[in-house]
Amino acid sequence: MSADSLFWPIFFAQYYSALESIAVVVAVLIMISSFDDLFIDAWYWTREIIRKFRFRNDDNYRPLTPEQIKEREEQHLAIMVPAWLEYDVIAQMIESMVATLDYRNYTVFVGTYVNDHRTIEEVERMRRRYKQLRRVEVPHDGPTCKADCLNWVIQAIFLHEQQAGIEFAGVILHDSEDVLHPLELKFFNYLLPRKDMIQLPVASLEREWYELVAGVYMDEFAEWHAKDLVVRESVTGTVPSAGVGTCFSRRALLALAATTDNQPFNTESLTEDYDVGNRLAAMGMKSIFAVFPVDFVTRGRRWFGLGPDLERVIRMPLCVREFFPDTFRT
């Protein structure tokens, strides 16, 4: 048999052997990178099983109920919303928030930039409608980092306290796309001032089955906020802020401001949410990733769009909901 006739069999044999070697290397790398997932799953489910049996056999254990959090006297709470070019959503967000929240003793502070005239107009329109709304002007052009806007909002909150003769027990961070649950402020009010940072889970609003990019975000956030953060809090005792649905106690904000020239949020960091969580942990502040089951009303279309929309009541943790991005560019 000539050498030419053996070329292709030898070539394909070597090619197949190389593919096998590459597959082994890739499999080993995937296995190594999956160890953390295996640890998280093992810790999470072991913890859940232990808690289930412990609390089931504890006659003194009573789950927290919505009625309990509603009974607590309302403290002053502030909501801060940084806004840059949010003119198309900010009014709807404010209207939805005011109509939804089952709470009276709160003030909303929206931070806008001097060169963002369309957002300013929308916020001013809402301010004339709702007495609990304040607009905070960042005195320089935007955009800047989120931390910069938040620091100006915090200064306005401190000034408002002096002028109104009140003290906010907690300050809650939200974005212009957030949809709140009616019991959110009641829940924060119940935990303050015992906890210094309270982080709620973040979940997506309903999406269609074919919105695949948004579906990837939904999967990632579901895994991160339903399991990973629970394990992280259990193992390390620290909780990072998610940038939305985060409540800071007055004590926490004053402590943060005291260490950074009266600017609680670090403008040198692009991940101010992680930064603030780590700084509070270093100060010995008490943080919690709060999981409190409540009822949500969801609406969705029927298969093939036939018939009226479906409305269901589902039980899931109290969370902040929003539409996650649905394009590759975002």
Where are these regions (language model features)?
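Internal catalytic domains of large membrane-associated glycosyltransferases
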Residues: 53-305, 309-318, 324
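N-terminal membrane-anchoring/stem segments of glycan-assembly enzymes
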Residues: 1-70
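Short hydrophobic helices that act as membrane-entry/anchoring signals
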Residues: 5, 9, 13-16, 33, ...
